Amino acid sequence: MRRIRLNLQNAINEEKLKEYVSEVEQINTKMNNLSLEGFEYLGWKDLPENINKNEIDKIIETANFFKKEGIEVLVVIGIGGSFLGAKSAMDFIQGNYPTKKNMEIIFAGTSISSTELTQLLYYVENKKFAINVISKSGTTLEPAIAFREFRNLLNSRLGENNAKRYIVATTDANKGLLFEMAKEKGYARFVVPDNVGGRFSVLTPVGLLPLACAGIDIEKLLEGAKEANALYKNSNLLENDAYKYAVARFLLQKKFPVEMLVSYEPNHMFLLEWWKQLFGESEGKQGKGILPHSAIFTRDLHSLGQFIQDGSKIMFETVIWVDKPIFDLKIEKEIEDLDKLNYLTNKSLHQINKAAFEATVEAHTKVGLVPNIILELEDSSEKTLGALFMFFERAVAMSGYLLKVNPFNQPGVEVYKSNLFKILEKK
């Protein structure tokens, strides 16, 4: 079942895709044979089929334990892929202001801001909270600092022996600082798989435990990913929309060094952030790659719209449109009509939003000459999001290999870390 429809008619001449059929087939075969650079991190591509049922049961049991214990807030501590996947999924499925009463999920360890961490500690001070700390090694500075502070707060309130019941570590299977700490202190543990990099980890316990605690059906999420995987593992470029997207981007980057991912739903903001990390870290190396940028329309049409329409031609857009939103609202007629909006009577807000989407695509492509790739999503369900995660992950792997870079490492981020530790005189 296709939950995502790709439209390239306003972006490229689709005949050009045929020139890459052979290369894409070769790359796909090598990915399947684990014979490409970075093969040791290809575990994500078969996650929906291979994830352990016992692990899913354990995740759901942990979420149910927290609910039974009356946990009001789960503090998820992690940075980058250790929080963006879960946060993006919660907002995508439930909206920015969830209407159902579920355990609240907050995220810490995403910065070194003293104000941010202090306010988060104050926020949970009088609430019953649990901690899910996520780090492969346990040495990443931002989550390590946050974990120390929240751990100390929980220990001071409950005593260390009782507090450990409400701390879960998602980390390496058998090594690392966090693994050793969790083992020594008796924290429950989930595993970050060795063959799955952080930015690809949303369908592992890294993303699944926070999502289960938030009341999201993680089995449906995985089911949607599994359905999509059957489509996106196809080596035939002309039948594989994820690979078509990758090739379209590859063609466009020859002229446009920036890609702006756009959505007309504000609750997709963290989906766009997740996508930026996925593509930015996977492609941006050896002086190559497309700069990933993002915008929420119609909001950002009132700030960036002028530049996109009339500014320097450095970008193409990939636009996400959702056919069926979480909620819709109909405009009712008012007798006085002081705001002169009665011409919209009986139109739904989603209809108006779609008109804005169509008008903007036409303006940007026909007048502004900005290529637009359209991704039309069926709805905001778990299954659709699972499919979208696999779509982007398959696409970025192919895109990286087309650029002749390893999509699964990120050597550039080590430079600032090394400098930081020198300044802090870490031995």
From Swiss-Prot:
Disulfide bonds: none
InterPro entries: G6P_Isomerase, Phosphoglucose_isomerase_CS, SIS_dom_sf, SIS_PGI_1, SIS_PGI_2
Keywords: Cytoplasm, Gluconeogenesis, Glycolysis, Isomerase
Pfam families in the record: PGI
CDD domains xrefs: SIS_PGI_1, SIS_PGI_2
Annotated GO CC locations: cytosol
Subcellular location(s) of the protein: Cytoplasm
GO annotation (BP), single: gluconeogenesis
PANTHER family: GLUCOSE-6-PHOSPHATE ISOMERASE
Family named by the database record: Belongs to the GPI family.
Protein name, as recorded: Glucose-6-phosphate isomerase
Taxonomic lineage from the root: Bacteria, Bacillati, Mycoplasmatota, Mycoplasmoidales, Metamycoplasmataceae
